[in-house]
Structures are given as structure tokens and as C-alpha cells.
Amino acid sequence: KKGVLTMDAILLSQDEVKGLITMKEVVEICNKTFQGLGDGTVINPTKVNLDLGETNPFPPYKGFMNAMPAYVGWADTAGIKWAGGFLGKRKEMGLPYITSLILLIDSEIGYFKAVMDGAHITNLRTGAQTANALRYMLNKKSIKLGLYGAGMQGHTQTHAISQLFDIEELRVYDVYKEAALKFAENMKDVVKGEIIVVDNPKDAAVGDAIVAVTQSKDKFIRNEWVKPGTIVFPMGSYQECDDEFILSADKIIVDHIGQALHRGALAESTEKGKITEENIFATIGELAAGKKECHISDDERILCVPIGTGAMDIAVASVVYKNAIEKGIGGKYKFA
């Protein structure tokens, strides 16, 4: 029955999830969850990484999986996302890079209340993280954006940022120019101003914010490209920015200190001992909760590294679950 809670788990496919949540909702859910991370009402252990050949030769599957548990106080929900990416056979089969499932439990009794696709939720919340970080750091409504990577995540980042800001100019670079041209066509109604497809990566490093969502293993964003007054978001699995920029940024902001130091843009500098916890100015949660302030000035450059936390996924999934129960959507399954 609609609106009735039982001990059955509900099962939700990606298509069902897509119909149960909007980007507008996700941006606000992530805002509340960042505040919870800042004030201690969200519990988010460091993700556990299983290397399936992403960085090691064995096993040879060119993939990884992460286990990402969290408890979100404002939603009173606990859960885990089991998610990863594969570039080997999965890519050959034409499947998306990311594979992802989210399990939710009743946090008081511990029964499994939902199992749902996590890929769409991951995509939306990854964009919403950036939008919220900008909300806490920029004191303006109209912004210019530089974007590296015109794939699914490039679209999602732009959608999310457009919920909170008017994008008056967007410069996009992709190694496949066709992808960038297609992006410009797809996003013309989302971006208020002009979308400029650039041939040289240097020409995309212009704006209030520079967002990189690529699978590049090259450190292609050069220190000398990044002008004062810019916030840079390297969101890929690897570094994307050169060492010089990482070590000379005026402030470093992260979503989760334990994770951000060991994966993504800061991992190599951490490994070499050049970056430590002492170098982190604040977490996005501290900014959201008002514990620290970081409004960018015209003469500083900020590096912001939101690696992604299970808390965001569980928070969004909790609202998807609530909407599914209210609308009577989803299959039922009794595990025990």
C-alpha cells in the first residue's frame, strides 16, 4: 500500500530512481548534509577501497570498488554505497564506467529497507557538491566557468551549478572535440550566457571556477594558467593539476580530510610528504556549518577537492526511498 512502512525491502531500478528525485532537491539535500558533516550529526567513515586492477597488475580487471558507509542525522538513515569503475571488459561492452548500488537500513532496528541503483544518485550528488562548495565561497550570483570533460559528469556539474548561479560564460575543453560540441548544444538552455568550445586546454582555465571531470592521468592544468580569484575543482580520479599549483594554492578545501589526502588530486603530494592535514584550511562541512569562512578574494587561488562521501549518497537515497514509499513505487523483497 502507498505510504505504509513494512519490514520488506524495496528495490528500485535506475529508471525508477530517476523519476523520484530532481537536481534541485539534490542540491538542497547536499547542503543540509554538508551542514551535518560540519556540526557532527553526520557520521562518515573513510571509504574502503578494493583495487581490482586500477593501479595494480593483479587482478587484471582495470577496476576498483569502494565501500562507503554513512549515517545521516537529519534523515535518520544509515546505509552503504558499494560502487566503483571499470575500464577493461566493462568498457569494451559499452557499459558506463561507474557501477553502483546503495543499501539503506532502518538505523534503529537494522533491517534492510531499500536496495537501489546508485549510479544516477552518484552523478547528481557529485555535481551538487561543487555547487554547494561554490555557494559557501563565492559572493556573487553570476559566474564564469571553465570546464574540462564534456561527458556525463560535465553535464551534471553544469546542471547543478546552474541551480545556484547564473552561468554567464562557460568555456569547455574535451580531448574529443565532438563531445564538447555536443555538450554545447545540449546545455545551451542551462547556461545563461555563451558556451565557448576551446581547442587548447589553456583556454578553458578562465573563470570564477574551473571544474575538471576527466579520467586523465596527466597533470594538464598548469599553475601559470590559474589566475588569482579562481577556485579550482579537480574532480577526476587522478591529479589533473600540476604539482606547482597544488603546492602554491592559497587555501585547500576538502570534503573529507581522510579521503582527500589519499585519493585524487592530493594523493601524490601527500605520499611525498609535501601535503599534510596541516595544509587543509577547512572542510566544506565547516564552511556549511559556519564554523569557518572562506569567501574567495581577488588575489587568492583556492584548490577545492570534493572526493565524494557516502553521506551524500545515503542522504539522497533516503529522500528517494521516502518518495518511493509515498508513491508506491518499487518492487518488494523479504530478505529475512
PLM ranges: what are they?
Residues 137-144, 166, 227-228:
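Short helix-loop-beta connector
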Residues 14-18, 245-336:
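Adenosine-phosphate binding glycine-rich loop
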Residues 164-187:
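NAD(P)-binding Rossmann-fold cofactor-contacting core
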Residues 150-151:
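Glycine-rich Rossmann-fold phosphate-binding loop(s) that bind the pyrophosphate
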Residues 207-208, 249:
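An anion/phosphate-binding loop that grips the pyrophosphate of nucleotide cofactors and donors
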Residues 3-123, 131, 141, 282, ...:
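N-terminal ligand-binding/catalytic initiation module
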Residues 191-207, 220-224:
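Short acidic low-complexity segments
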Residues 209, 216-233, 243-244:
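Rossmann-fold NAD(P) dinucleotide-binding segment
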